[in-house]
Amino acid sequence: MSFVVTAPPVLASAASDLGGIASMISEANAMAAVRTTALAPAAADEVSAAIAALFSSYARDYQTLSVQVTAFHVQFAQTLTNAGQLYAVVDVGNGVLLKTEQQVLGVINAPTQTLVGRPLIGDGTHGAPGTGQNGGAGGILWGNGGNGGSGAPGQPGGRGGDAGLFGHGGHGGVGGPGIAGAAGTAGLPGGNGANGGSGGIGGAGGAGGNGGLLFGNGGAGGQGGSGGLGGSGGTGGAGMAAGPAGGTGGIGGIGGIGGAGGVGGHGSALFGHGGINGDGGTGGMGGQGGAGGNGWAAEGITVGIGEQGGQGGDGGAGGAGGIGGSAGGIGGSQGAGGHGGDGGQGGAGGSGGVGGGGAGAGGDGGAGGIGGTGGNGSIGGAAGNGGNGGRGGAGGMATAGSDGGNGGGGGNGGVGVGSAGGAGGTGGDGGAAGAGGAPGHGYFQQPAPQGLPIGTGGTGGEGGAGGAGGDGGQGDIGFDGGRGGDGGPGGGGGAGGDGSGTFNAQANNGGDGGAGGVGGAGGTGGTGGVGADGGRGGDSGRGGDGGNAGHGGAAQFSGRGAYGGEGGSGGAGGNAGGAGTGGTAGSGGAGGFGGNGADGGNGGNGGNGGFGGINGTFGTNGAGGTGGLGTLLGGHNGNIGLNGATGGIGSTTLTNATVPLQLVNTTEPVVFISLNGGQMVPVLLDTGSTGLVMDSQFLTQNFGPVIGTGTAGYAGGLTYNYNTYSTTVDFGNGLLTLPTSVNVVTSSSPGTLGNFLSRSGAVGVLGIGPNNGFPGTSSIVTAMPGLLNNGVLIDESAGILQFGPNTLTGGITISGAPISTVAVQIDNGPLQQAPVMFDSGGINGTIPSALASLPSGGFVPAGTTISVYTSDGQTLLYSYTTTATNTPFVTSGGVMNTGHVPFAQQPIYVSYSPTAIGTTTFN
């Protein structure tokens, strides 16, 4: 039958709206009647009179019909109003009846509630969260059981309440989480750190309530609580002066075991399904490995060797899946047994501890959890599938210059369980292994000119082995055995460490990529069931495929002149699972056939070779992985993995390239260069001069014949004589100029160029200004190859010097570099046009006496605001207030020198177009 839901207030509102519509229509009809019922003829002829009479008759007919429609409208609105009033009266009566029904139900339930604490009709109460309280039982005659409350930390969840004759059982409560383990204590000087405490076990999930005796499903079991976090390992003690090695960091605590899933409730004896069991709780995360102690600087040793960081704790095992509830009884509707819950996810392995001042290795990742066991099927029902294995923990991160930790192994798949009348359950897949930990970068400690050895990037950690697939369940009478689970894939090897090739350090090799993990073995197929009378036994299940091996790690980019690391070898393919045993013959039936063996997994691909540095040598490609072995009964060997890709050849043309920029004393920018393949030396980056000028005492290599001589000087009083040579300038990372003019000082007064630059520690001046006419024969930037000679971006805040086109957008560009024309304002005074030199090497700068309105020979007073605008005075370029240590010197000249201030406030790009003029862009 159909049902009608009515809201009396809505009907009353609709009737009111209809009344308003009727009024508007009546007014419109009255207005139309005046103009349409008595039309005047358009002319005095008979035709015009006939047309006017015809249309007037139409209008009168419309008015007659409108009166009838209005009457119907009024009747309809009145009907809606009456209906709303009647529904309102009925609602009042129904409310009284409902109240009476609740009172009657209370009277019915009172005796049983008093005698046995359970209503005759009604649902049971739910357990309070966090208490593990059991759910209340449902009504004896009719009602569902209440849900169990969740458990307190480490405690089980409450059991679901049972139903009566008719009703569903309540769900079991979730188990409480495990308590975290205590952290290990730090070691004494030279000693090892203490191990972290293990995490607590998660509480078990509550059991599901039973379904009604006559009808109803069993309640689902509660989920097991997650295991507690393992405690962090203690920090290793620092090395003693007598012995340079620091202590080993403590091992991280083992993560707590996840709680077991709750048992599903039993279904009704006649009609109903068994409850689904709860999943096992998640395993706790392994504790963080303790940091290795720093090496102590011993007598005659530059740097002590730090001990290895503590190993990360294993992830906790996942909780076992709960057992599925039994299904309906004999003669009733046969419900399926509950599926076995998945094993809890294995906790991630703790990261390896940080190595000491030398190069400690990262700890290994923890192992993954084990998958849950499949639930038992009821008579006639199918068996539950085995749970999947937990995923292996990731390998620990390595420190600078050390190897990455190995990935944890994947958990094994759960075993399927056969059932009466059903096929064997499928074994769970093995968990995927964790990836190998990433290694650190190559560590360098001393500048290259001293010729000390520099560390190489660490080797990537090996990927963890894949978990084995679960065995297939045994088939019952006349049914096939379950299929074995697939083996988990091996984890990928960690990437090799980067080689370093930065300023003030020798280039070194990139680390090798880690080997891929071995694929997990496939599960064995289940045994076939005994043949039924007159029938044949079931075939055994097929063995699971071996997991594919993990890929070898790819080696990373190395510095110029160094070799890229070799790609890691691919992991071996997992062996195929064994064939299942054929079923036993039934009476008169033929025995089942053994299943075919699965193919072995393919070997993983070798890792890519590392890219050589610019103009460097390319890396070696990695070897392919070994194919997995097939089984004796029909399996095929896996294919050999492909070789890794050949490392890239160093690039010779670039659009942009960057080198480090070091700021000395917060005011002097310094970069490192090498002339004609010599040692790397520091030079002052100076936009206020043109050409490279070097102190001869730091240059020992032969530059060839002298191509010119001259005499020049710098503001500050230094005058020098020089020889000019044609040679190459190397900025590192393969940034090598074409042969260009370099000025080498032969004599100077007063003192040497090195003494003149002693504040910055530089041994030369790299003048990059296009239009200032200062000493030198050419700018080094114009000798850069390709587009790198377009200009240079100076970004002191980021610590970089970038060659090539400007990569920043939205800047303000003015003509001239470094000499240009600007408008200057002193405090709130008027704007004054003045020539200016944007001089990165000018320290605090100078200002003309006429511009500052101050006598020459002194400094601008602290607290003076100097603002510099474009020459039209419309756009501010930069502004600052002077201090006692940052104020320009007042000179009698006519050109303002900005000093370092604008470069400290923002990135500035110097363009070499147009030639000999250039532009300056404030970004």
From Swiss-Prot:
Metal-binding as UniProt keyword: yes
Domain PE: 1-91
Motif (D(T/S)G 1): 686-688
GO molecular function, one term: metal ion binding
Annotated Gene Ontology cellular component terms: cell surface
UniProtKB keywords: Metal-binding, Zinc
Positions with a binding annotation for Zn(2+): 686, 839
Metal-binding in keyword set: yes
Region annotation Aspartic proteinase-like domain: where it falls in the sequence: 650-923
Compositional bias (Gly residues): 124-170, 427-440, 454-500, 510-553
Predominant location: other
InterPro entries reported in the protein's UniProt record: PE-PGRS_N, PecA_C, Peptidase_aspartic_dom_sf, PGRS_rpt
Top-level lineage group: Bacteria
Localization: Cell surface
Disordered, as annotated region: 121-170, 330-351, 427-561
Induction context: Expression is induced in macrophages and infected mice. Highly up-regulated during the early stages of invasion of the human blood-brain barrier.
Signal peptide: none
Intervals of motif D(T/S)G 2: 839-841
Protein family: Belongs to the mycobacterial PE family. PGRS subfamily.
This protein's domain notes: Contains an aspartic proteinase-like domain in the C-terminal region. However, the enzyme is inactive. A comparison of the structure with pepsins showed significant differences in the critical substrate binding residues and in the flap tyrosine conformation that could contribute to the lack of proteolytic activity of PE_PGRS16.
Other facts: Expression of this gene in M.smegmatis leads to increased levels of NO and IL-12 and poor survival of recombinant strains in macrophages.
Name assigned to this protein: PE-PGRS family protein PE_PGRS16
